[in-house]
């Protein structure tokens, strides 16, 4: 479905943003 595709893109975006904030030790989003 369209929503699932959007969710996957959003999750990828969140992971990319999270990686850019590794300095803050913000790794909980990757663990989900």
UniProtKB/Swiss-Prot annotation:
GO biological process: proteolysis
Record's subcellular location: Secreted
Annotated source species: Echis carinatus
Family: Belongs to the venom metalloproteinase (M12B) family. P-III subfamily. P-IIId sub-subfamily.
UniProt KW keywords: Blood coagulation cascade activating toxin, Calcium, Disulfide bond, Hemostasis impairing toxin, Hydrolase, Metal-binding, Metalloprotease, Protease, Prothrombin activator, Secreted, Toxin, Zinc
UniProt domain Peptidase M12B: residue ranges: 10-32
Any GO CC annotation of this UniProt entry: extracellular region
Cited function: Calcium-dependent prothrombin (F2) activator. This protein may activate prothrombin via recognition by the regulatory subunit of the calcium ion bound conformation of its gamma-carboxyglutamic acid (GLA) domain, and the subsequent conversion of prothrombin to active thrombin is catalyzed by the catalytic subunit.
Top-level taxon of the source organism: Eukaryota
Biotechnology: Used for quantification of normal prothrombin (CA-1 method).
Known partners and oligomeric status: Heterodimer of a metalloproteinase subunit and a regulatory subunit comprising two disulfide-linked lectins (14 kDa and 17 kDa chains) (AC Q9PRP7 and AC Q9PRP8).
GO molecular function terms listed in the Swiss-Prot or TrEMBL record: metal ion binding; metallopeptidase activity; peptidase activator activity; toxin activity
Protein name: Zinc metalloproteinase carinactivase-1 catalytic subunit
Entry keyword Ligase: no
Cofactor binding mode and count: Binds 1 zinc ion per subunit.
Cofactor field: Zn(2+)
Expression by tissue: Expressed by the venom gland.
Entry's EC annotation: 3.4.24.-
The keyword Transferase is assigned to this record: no
Chief localization: secreted
């Amino acid at each position: 479905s369209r929503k699932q595709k959007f969710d996957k893109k959003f999750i990828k975006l969140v992971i990319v943003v999270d990686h850019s904030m590794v300095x803050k030790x913000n790794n909980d989003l990757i663990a989900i």
